[in-house]
Amino acid sequence: MTSRRFAYVLSLAILLALPASAQAGGHVASATGVKQVKGKTLYVDVVVAVPAGETARHATDRALSEQGASRAKPPWAGGPGGGSGGGGGGGGGEQYFYNGLKWSPPTVTQNYNGANAPIAAQTALINTYSDWSNVTGSTYRISSGGTTTRCPSLVKECPGAQVNDARNDVGWAGLGGTTLGVTWFTPSSPEADMALNTLFTWKSTCGTSGGSAYDVETVFLHENGHVAGLDHANRTDSVMYPSYQAPRCTLFDYDRRSIANLY
């Protein structure tokens, strides 16, 4: 079997056959990496279940390495109201963070492949479209293109080379290590592909008790922030903060201001 197994990765990847300390549905961390593929720059966001006794930095560095990427901060991220979004930001020079993706027109159609999914997750994915699309002052919209049989083309675990196919697909893959999911994106030729790890235990209803299960809508909500063009935020009142220990089922006001500033 090829090393690029039938799998789907969009800046999210996890593994059930990992240390029990990483299966508690607890501390989750996220980081962005960069990879060169045939002269093209690809970025990937990894979402990782951090094992007990390990730092978030070490866990995310390992996950990035498994994706063939190295830690990188997009050069356009940061700055008061800045990044690729421009504009003046919020009151008092509030700082926003962007990853270089900016859609023109500001619309994204996302397709879902549920093959090998351990739970019914499409409804949770669609729920996040309402969050990111219905922000006062923002023209950004993301919607469902229905289902697909495609493996997201930018995902490392998919068959063949990592290439742009001008589609934004979401799927599932057997990702390694402690990765819950990945989102790969290319600002130069706007595209974003996502995959979650089939090997973890998930729950589909955000905010409900799930024991050791990880909340799939929380991961989709964070990753679709990256799809919209947002980078990790430096404040905890944001779904884009790169660490959390409890489900996040809706945007914070800061997230709404961030995307309204970009679009």
Named regions from a protein language model:
Residues 9-19:
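Bacterial N-terminal signal peptides
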Residues 1-9:
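Bacterial N-terminal signal peptides that target proteins for export
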